[in-house]
């Protein structure tokens, strides 16, 4: 084992706080959705994680897609999320306020607002 006397530069390479009023809305958008990035490689150097906010309009859904090598975590604030996943989107689960959804790398999936009346906020 090689020992070094240098300490990590925790000031510039430690904990990062991304303020709610400093999200990046210059992200790929899907009709019926509003996305804003908080945590990604460009903003904080995250290697395999994307985190941000998503609002899905009533009765809207994404097309089938995956996020490549990135892991995604979704926290439902308001509304009802319906997730479909698999090669044919054959699996389905729902999540509500306070629930977390984990999407592993390369998993084909679709996000759906299960409500025809209320927006889904994640």
Predicted regions: what they are:
Residues 43-44, 69, 88, 116-117:
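Short strand-connecting beta-turns/loops that link adjacent beta-strands
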Residues 34-40, 52-68, 105:
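Conserved short histidine dyad/triad with adjacent acidic residue
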Residues 94-97, 105-122:
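Ligand-binding loop in jelly-roll beta-barrel domains
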Residues 57, 86, 104, 114:
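Residue-level recognition of the GNAT/N-acetyltransferase active site
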Residues 31, 36-40, 48-51, 90-97, ...:
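General detector of folded, globular domains
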Residues 53-54, 73, 102, 117-122:
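A short hydrophobic beta-strand segment most commonly corresponding to one strand
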Residues 61, 67-97, 107:
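A short beta-strand-loop-beta hairpin characteristic of the jelly-roll/cupin
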Residues 1-48, 63:
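A short, N-terminal "cap"/entry segment at the start of jelly-roll beta-barrel domains
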């Amino acid at each position: 084992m090689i020992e070094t006397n240098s300490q990590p530069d925790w000031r510039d390479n430690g904990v990062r706080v991304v303020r709610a009023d400093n999200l990046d809305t210059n992200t790929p958008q899907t009709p019926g959705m509003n996305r804003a990035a908080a945590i990604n490689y460009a903003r904080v150097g995250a290697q395999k994680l994307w985190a941000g906010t998503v609002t899905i309009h009533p009765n809207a859904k994404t097309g089938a897609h995956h996020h490549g090598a990135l892991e995604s975590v979704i926290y439902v604030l308001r509304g009802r999320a319906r997730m479909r996943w698999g090669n044919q989107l054959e699996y389905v689960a729902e999540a509500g306020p306070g629930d977390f959804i984990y999407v592993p790398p390369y998993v084909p999936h679709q996000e759906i607002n299960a409500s025809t009346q209320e927006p889904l906020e994640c």
